[in-house]
Amino acid sequence: MADFTSSLHSQQLALTRYLRDPDGYSPPAGMNPVRARVYLDLVLNNLLGLLGGTFPVLVAVLGDAGWRALVRRFLRDYRAQTPRFGEVAREFVDFVASLEDSPGHEHPWYPFLPELAHYEWVEMALQQLDAAPLVASDAAQLLDRPLRLSPLVWPLAYTWAVHRLGPGNLPSEAPEQPTLLLISRVPSGEVQFSQVSPLAWRLLQRIEQFPDMDGRAQLHALAAEAGASDVASFVADALVLLHQLHEQAAVGVAAAPVFRLLS
């Protein structure tokens, strides 16, 4: 029995090595090469289909042959940290990011590919996120209460203009200014992308960083960061922005603490 188990394990190991790297390993001894090839094509095509739907721009940028080579390399070299089929795309983003220092020559490479992969993955991640929108709050309390960022709203910053990349736009140098985006899931379930100003992006980031700070303190701290010479005017303009974000349900007011009387 022990010999059988050991033999089975050896066969399984040989098969998985072949499926990961058919150029480096042969099918298990005694296995029909034609059948082994069927398994190889099945695994690779399933992975191509799974990832291709999440990264359509990446596929278009690399072309069919380049995309196939990248996915084959992912299968060969990367060791996923989760067995969950639905999280393979997140693992693929990490894999592409890991190639920055050693892109290799098996497929085309552009320095923006890691950010493009992340940008495309974000849409799926936010669609699948198990989170509820903020509870409606009173705009009159925006200055006096701590603020909250909706879990369905993600402020993101990219070195590259990821929303403009495609087969017809393959820059070799990043723009001077970062691309600041607001990714949000609306009630219909659709994920929307919008470009935001540095002021709006930093305000949203601060709300995440300093959840105990009330709105007034947030705006004054923002004015100090910006080096505003006219603080009152800056805060007034920022308050208009804060109200807009509140109307969009991107930002809300923290619930007031509940105090219970001791009996």
What residue spans do the PLM features occupy?
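N-terminal, charged low-complexity regulatory/assembly segments
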Residues: 1-129
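Hydrophobic packing positions characteristic
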Residues: 76-201
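Short helix-to-turn junction characteristic of helix-turn-helix DNA-binding domains
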Residues: 206-211
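Short acidic, hydrophobic short linear motifs in intrinsically disordered regions
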Residues: 212-224
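Basic amphipathic alpha-helical segments that dock to polyanions
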Residues: 237-249
